[in-house]
Amino acid sequence: MLLAPACAELELLTGGSRGGPGPPPSGSLSVSFIDVSQGDGVLVQAGGESYLIDAVRPEEGPSVVDFLRSRGVDSLDGIVVSNPDADHIGGFLDVFDAFPVETVFVSGDPNSTLTYNTFLRGVRDEGATTEVLRAGMLMDWGGVRADT
């Protein structure tokens, strides 16, 4: 049985309030933690951009997609893979099917499992740019600095 994702949110607003589902107001940072039983995903929305960190197990992928849609996501500027284990990457194939993804940030940890190889094929088929995360790397996510 799939559980609908529960969500806790941290929002830093420059004015106004979120007022429920949909994209965050202009000029705000929204960080949503997507809890789907084992593992978490994190959605970061800022400056009109959306980034997803981890997408949990394969069977939870549809719940992640539903959650992203409920937050007004129609494309992802980037996804981040914190490690290549199935409980961090399994749901990304559903995400690739549902949304265009511009950049995929991978940890660079070696892995040759079927799940990881399937994920890499999905990245290739998506046509996304791939970047390997490294210590001290700085990224601009919609005007918000993300660093490793």
Predicted regions and their residues:
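Non-globular, low-confidence helical/coil segments that flank catalytic cores
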Residues: A4-T148
